[in-house]
Amino acid sequence: MKIKKADFVKSAVYEKDYPEQLDKMEFAFVGRSNVGKSSLINSLTSRLKLARTSKTPGRTQLINYFLINDEFYIVDLPGYGFAKVPKEMKKQWGQTMERYIASKRKKLVFVLLDIRRVPSDEDIEMLEWLEYNEMDYKIIFTKIDKLSNNERAKQLKAIKTRLVFDNEDVFFHSSLTNKGRDEILNFMEEKLNN
């Protein structure tokens, strides 16, 4: 798939704030703070500043909607697991995400995991929660450029002590080199055509 047009539409907290079009597919991106959600969105759309990136974890505090090719939405969800945020704010982010995931919108959730880290309890809870809600989801391992092939193989072995998956069922992505970009876009196109 070629992304020719990508526009920020709006930020939302409550369901009443979501875009009104229910017929458009939504690809939502969720993961720990600083896992690279905004960088991945910028990589997929080939727009360096579409989704705001920051070295400071916890910058994405709202649900951000981007309309792609006037056909579907990319949705940037708030990150979870950032310790330096007040408990009340964490609770609010959690409720914002819960409302979105529980909404009856046509969506697929991409769960982003940093390949350098074994999945946290929060990552596992997110995956279990998606399964409990019978949500369609895929895992994307980010920051693959930070490890050599040998280190990556070792790390995947460690990750599999906490998470069961086949390498063919997940995506591997680098925002630095755009490795994995085409595979993710092709998968999204398949979902749109089904």
UniProtKB/Swiss-Prot annotation:
<dbReference type="InterPro" id="IPR006073">
    <property type="entry name" value="GTP-bd"/>
</dbReference>
<dbReference type="Pfam" id="PF01926">
    <property type="entry name" value="MMR_HSR1"/>
</dbReference>
<feature type="domain" description="EngB-type G">
    <location>
        <begin position="23"/>
        <end position="194"/>
    </location>
</feature>
<dbReference type="InterPro" id="IPR030393">
    <property type="entry name" value="G_ENGB_dom"/>
</dbReference>
<feature type="binding site">
    <location>
        <begin position="31"/>
        <end position="38"/>
    </location>
    <ligand>
        <name>GTP</name>
    </ligand>
</feature>
<feature type="binding site">
    <location>
        <position position="60"/>
    </location>
    <ligand>
        <name>Mg(2+)</name>
    </ligand>
</feature>
<dbReference type="GO" id="GO:0005525">
    <property type="term" value="F:GTP binding"/>
</dbReference>
<dbReference type="GO" id="GO:0046872">
    <property type="term" value="F:metal ion binding"/>
</dbReference>
<comment type="function">
    <text>Necessary for normal cell division and for the maintenance of normal septation.</text>
</comment>
<feature type="binding site">
    <location>
        <position position="38"/>
    </location>
    <ligand>
        <name>Mg(2+)</name>
    </ligand>
</feature>
<dbReference type="GO" id="GO:0000917">
    <property type="term" value="P:division septum assembly"/>
</dbReference>
<protein>
    <recommendedName>
        <fullName>Probable GTP-binding protein EngB</fullName>
    </recommendedName>
</protein>
<feature type="binding site">
    <location>
        <begin position="173"/>
        <end position="175"/>
    </location>
    <ligand>
        <name>GTP</name>
    </ligand>
</feature>
<keyword id="KW-0132">Cell division</keyword>
<keyword id="KW-0547">Nucleotide-binding</keyword>
<keyword id="KW-0479">Metal-binding</keyword>
<dbReference type="InterPro" id="IPR027417">
    <property type="entry name" value="P-loop_NTPase"/>
</dbReference>
<feature type="binding site">
    <location>
        <begin position="76"/>
        <end position="79"/>
    </location>
    <ligand>
        <name>GTP</name>
    </ligand>
</feature>
<comment type="similarity">
    <text>Belongs to the TRAFAC class TrmE-Era-EngA-EngB-Septin-like GTPase superfamily. EngB GTPase family.</text>
</comment>
<feature type="binding site">
    <location>
        <begin position="142"/>
        <end position="145"/>
    </location>
    <ligand>
        <name>GTP</name>
    </ligand>
</feature>
<keyword id="KW-0131">Cell cycle</keyword>
<keyword id="KW-0342">GTP-binding</keyword>
<dbReference type="InterPro" id="IPR019987">
    <property type="entry name" value="GTP-bd_ribosome_bio_YsxC"/>
</dbReference>
<keyword id="KW-0460">Magnesium</keyword>
<dbReference type="GO" id="GO:0005829">
    <property type="term" value="C:cytosol"/>
</dbReference>
<keyword id="KW-0717">Septation</keyword>
<feature type="binding site">
    <location>
        <begin position="58"/>
        <end position="62"/>
    </location>
    <ligand>
        <name>GTP</name>
    </ligand>
</feature>
